[in-house]
């Protein structure tokens, strides 16, 4: 594993109690950061914090993990979480907007309206709200790294997943706009567009859709969460210094543009 220096940094990872978020949190801890998990599931959050604490090696405040239960689609809840995190850690250097849902699969005209709205709320409105409250704290210090976990579905549009694809396309556009707005302020904003990784999100999909996604990947396998965590770690570091509003592909050759 290549060493990426996040020593002394404070990172917020949304949806950090499982899957991709957990792997990112683990990589951050191994790189010396303090990590704050924001997640809606209190039980999984408690377990993840405990497991990650065992991975951490606290030295001078590094490798510390905190957990906070947050409904990321609620503006007031995100405001409180931001306030509480700043009160606990003193600052937020890194924000990873990872929390997301698929909403199942179905033809666009047959998908439930409320499910469609919920997917957009979690996958797009949630990251907007976290940026809305965290960015001012980053600007006050003149430094920040924001990484949005989008999806190749946002670039290509997956059939029978219009709600998910549209929400991730919106997140890509949010990244581009915010990246331009903050380009001269010391806060860099980038997105990653991974192919599918085997996580609990597969439980929300049909087997036919899972097979479709695998068939689109030239490397013939799904993404490993550790591979994505490695890319996110670099994007969250000072070494990422001249990329903002950009979209980084990690799809095993599916998207080469």
Spans of model-derived segments:
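The beta1-alpha1 cofactor-binding region of Rossmann-like NAD(H)/NADP(H)-dependent oxidoreductases
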Residues: 42-43, 69-81, 113, 226
